[in-house]
């Protein structure tokens, strides 16, 4: 059988390109090394609860085009992301807002909060030299020590004094009693989970799971849309790109309500995990049991652990730019998505990127990879 496109990866970028190309009659084959579609957005129903297998995914966007497009494939509920921080068994509202400051200092006005932060941040004189100094200068030492230091050091597996200040360019502080984590116009969780979206996108398209692009026998001499790690594609010839990664331990709990909220951030460094996720709260499941996940940062080992978050520091950006230059020379391959572009994408951003790619290939009838 002949194909027009081989798409490597059944996450959002690959699945959207497949859908749009298939819609205009192109013959497409999609492969994925995992045993399921959906990439890191994959959800799995357990006890009438849709488990976010690779960690919580809350859809949010202010992009009207993206919102309208994704609603073809799912009905979204009215879930609003309001995580809570746990530090030494005391709870604080997130993101930093007047509830947080009331819980921390008893402050009830913007003036009080600004005075406290200004006094605490004044200990940093001159230009901050590292992440710790940058954070203290922005929000003071109480907020830093309680809600930032331990969580950040667990995420990066390094002391905050060793981390570059550029990681925290700014810290959003709200002087209102508003716990909504996102500022976007639209927000929610697809009713029935994310996997159903991918099943609809890939309906009628040949999909091969458990298929490794580098070892499987695949159609040759056709155009490729590659959404895997770009450094792996080029045989790591410029070095391996770094990622932050986590392990998730999923556990069934025989209670109808374990923690009362979808996500709790654990900011105490002595607690090894960074988050606990109670999945039933995403869709308000009435299941008599609950599924809870413990998320713990681990060392990233290429091809052994899952790459989650690109480490876009100067060193890794320099390596990526070499791969990007190589990608520009590939006349039949386009690199897309978080791994293919070594870029942190929220879901709405990767959807917009994939739609633009598909538009270029579909309606403009041109092929300009990697521009």
Identify what each model region corresponds to.
Residues 22-47:
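Glycine-rich FAD pyrophosphate-binding loop
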Residues 12-13, 35-36, 99, 153-154, ...:
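Short, solvent-exposed loop/turn segments at secondary-structure junctions
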Residues 43-69:
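N-terminal glycine-rich dinucleotide-binding loop that anchors FAD/FMN and/or NAD(P) in oxidoreductases
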Residues 85-222, 227, 232-234:
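Active-site/ligand-binding neighborhood in enzyme catalytic cores
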Residues 222, 232-370:
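C-terminal segments that line or cap access tunnels to active or ligand-binding sites in enzymes
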Residues 3-30, 358:
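N-terminal Rossmann-like FAD-binding beta1-loop-alpha1 element of flavoenzymes
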Residues 19, 23, 43, 203, ...:
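Short, well-ordered alpha-helices that flank and scaffold nucleotide-derived cofactor binding pockets
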Residues 66-88, 143-146:
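A short alpha-helix-loop-beta-strand transition element characteristic
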């Amino acid at each position: 059988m002949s194909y027009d496109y081989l798409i490597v990866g059944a996450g959002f970028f690959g699945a959207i390109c497949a859908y749009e190309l298939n819609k205009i009659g192109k013959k497409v084959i999609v492969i994925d090394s995992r045993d399921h579609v959906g990439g890191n957005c994959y959800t799995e129903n357990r006890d009438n609860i849709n488990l976010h297998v690779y960690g919580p995914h809350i859809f949010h966007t202010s992009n009207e085009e993206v919102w309208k497009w994704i609603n073809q494939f799912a009905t979204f509920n009215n879930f609003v992301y309001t995580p809570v921080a746990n530090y030494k068994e005391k709870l604080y509202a997130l993101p930093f807002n007047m509830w947080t400051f009331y819980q921390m200092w008893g402050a009830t006005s913007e003036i009080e909060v600004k005075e406290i932060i200004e006094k605490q941040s004044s200990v940093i004189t001159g230009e901050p030299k590292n992440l710790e100094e940058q954070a203290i200068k922005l929000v003071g030492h109480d907020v830093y020590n309680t809600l930032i230091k331990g969580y950040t050091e667990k995420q990066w597996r390094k002391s905050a004094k060793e981390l570059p200040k550029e990681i925290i360019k700014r810290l959003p502080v709200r002087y209102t009693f508003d716990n909504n984590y996102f500022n976007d116009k639209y927000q929610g969780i697809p009713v029935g989970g994310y996997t159903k979206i991918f099943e609809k996108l890939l309906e009628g398209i040949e999909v091969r799971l458990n298929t490794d692009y580098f070892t499987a026998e695949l159609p040759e001499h056709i155009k490729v849309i590659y959404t895997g790690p770009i450094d792996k594609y080029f045989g790591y010839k410029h070095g391996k790109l770094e990622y932050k990664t986590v392990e998730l331990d999923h556990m069934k709990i025989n209670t109808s309500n374990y923690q009362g909220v979808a996500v709790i951030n654990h900011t105490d460094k002595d607690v090894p995990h960074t988050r606990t996720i109670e999945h039933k709260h995403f869709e308000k499941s009435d299941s008599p049991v609950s599924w809870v996940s413990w998320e713990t940062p681990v060392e990233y080992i290429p091809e052994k652990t899952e790459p989650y978050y690109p480490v876009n520091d100067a060193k890794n950006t320099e390596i990526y730019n070499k791969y990007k230059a190589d990608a520009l020379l590939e006349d039949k391959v386009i690199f897309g998505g978080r791994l293919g572009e070594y870029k942190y994408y929220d879901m709405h951003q990767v959807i917009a990127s994939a739609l633009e790619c598909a538009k270029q290939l579909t309606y403009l009838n041109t092929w300009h990879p990697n521009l």
